[in-house]
Amino acid sequence: MSGHSKWATIKHAKGAADAKRGQLFTKLSREIIFAAKQGGPSPEGNARLRLAIQKAKDSRMPSDNIERAIKKGSGELEGTTVIEMILEGYGPGGVAVLVNGMSDNRNRTVSDVRHMFSKGGGSLAESGAVSWIFEAKGVIGVETARLDTDELSLKAIDMGAEDVNTDEGYMEIYTAMPDMEKIRQQLETQGVTIDSAEINMVPKNTVKLDEETAMQVLKLLDKLEELDDVQTVSSNADFDPEVVEKYHSQA
């Protein structure tokens, strides 16, 4: 798993997953609404809602917004119906791309994603085309500028983490989905500040790209994530850190 697309690290280095704070809060609200609708409004008995709330808090989303989203999901407040969809496609160089979308209009979302793939040198594919390349994993992000990365890596593995990846002052800790919350709590108990913790679709294998193709793929992934209806984007590209730095210096 080490050597995957490092997409969480790339987003961290960029400064934020979304260019607009308001757009980020909208996406977080949708996740909370959907989770509350699917599993009920109590975080104690709804792991997905618990994770969505923690992610919103990590992003400094106001507590009033969080409570309102929970009430919309439970039906206590009126709100639009949110549906979840997984869209699959290929980017430049045949890179596999998985898009997690949430919206109140599937046709609009599919149309927007298809347009962005086409514009970015890729194509939207049929269901099942690339999803088999990915598996769901917990990914815990930690800033490591003031930490002993070797010691932290050993701690994480001892706690049950499956793998770690360190790159330019940032560490990603990979866990089985059911273990993520437990490992996060153990790290926090030992004084480690968690930057993010979420379920990501991680590729089982990755592909190396030349610089030109990598730049095209990075742009496509960015543009897809900027769409209002897109929650997360995963790919099986393995980016050279120097190329990523060059891309962001030009973006």
From Swiss-Prot:
Source species, domain of life: Bacteria
Presence of the UniProt keyword Repeat in the record: no
Membrane-traversing stretches: none
InterPro entries for the chain: Integrase-like_N (IPR017856), TACO1_YebC-like_2nd/3rd_dom (IPR048300), TACO1_YebC_N (IPR049083), Transcrip_reg_TACO1-like (IPR002876), Transcrip_reg_TACO1-like_dom3 (IPR026564), YebC-like (IPR029072)
GO cellular component labels: cytosol
Single Gene Ontology MF annotation: DNA binding
Cellular location(s): Cytoplasm
Keyword hit for Transcription regulation: yes
One Pfam family per UniProt: Transcrip_reg
Gene Ontology biological-process entries: regulation of DNA-templated transcription
SUPFAM superfamilies: YebC-like (SSF75625)
Keywords: Cytoplasm, DNA-binding, Transcription, Transcription regulation
Similarity comment: family membership: Belongs to the TACO1 family.
HAMAP family associated with the record: Transcrip_reg_TACO1
The name this protein goes by in its record: Probable transcriptional regulatory protein DehaBAV1_0421
